[in-house]
Amino acid sequence: MKFSFAALASAMLLTSTAAFAGIVTSSSNIDFLAIDGQKANKDLLKSTKSFNINESQTHQVVVRVSEIVRHGSDRSLYESDPIVVTFQGTNEDVVISAPKLENERDIKNFKDSPSVIVKTNSGRIIATKQEILKQEGFLPGANLIDTLSEYNASGSVASVSSFATAMPAVALGFTKAQKGKVVVQGENIAEQQLQFWFQQADKETQVRFLNWAKNQK
């Protein structure tokens, strides 16, 4: 009888916890770089590129806005600086979205005032604190989590002190490429960046990239 009561209590607790959880997704032009102080890897993101939040917690996500933008008759890839977004969790599902960027004017306007919108599926705008995550050095994205940890310890606008000492994603078993030493060689920055990101990718992505590169000859 005691076992049955304990099992029932546990089930009720799990049900209650689940009832207060929402799911966060994003518009197609947003990538999640970090979630609550940790690298946004497969351990944190679902196959649908979403993650759970809890209404009793403050959550923080680092996002990047990416768009293929027209420049006259040409097109190029625009990628924003990382944006730190902090907000209170909710039991509703949430969408983080950025405006559509189609041309140079849109890019300029976004650079002048980079921000995203956090909105529930019911249409309620969630209050946020946002700030660009400043990065330095060669391939600054490689040290994103360290930079974010320092940011969270700084007391800045969108910082969350409890995430300042978050365990690095490498310790969670992120990818083989990140566990080992990444070595880049090349005569220019572009070549070195290609080598770096190739080593960060999983095997399937590397194969697709190599097949794509062969077709560019």
From Swiss-Prot:
The keyword Transcription regulation does not apply. InterPro entries: UPF0319 (IPR018635). The lineage of its organism: Bacteria, Pseudomonadati, Pseudomonadota, Gammaproteobacteria, Pasteurellales. Keywords: Signal. It comes from Histophilus somni (strain 129Pt) (Haemophilus somnus). It holds the Pfam family DUF2057. Belongs to the UPF0319 family. HAMAP family: UPF0319 (MF_00789). The keyword Glycoprotein does not apply. Residues 1-21 form the signal peptide. This is UPF0319 protein HS_1349.
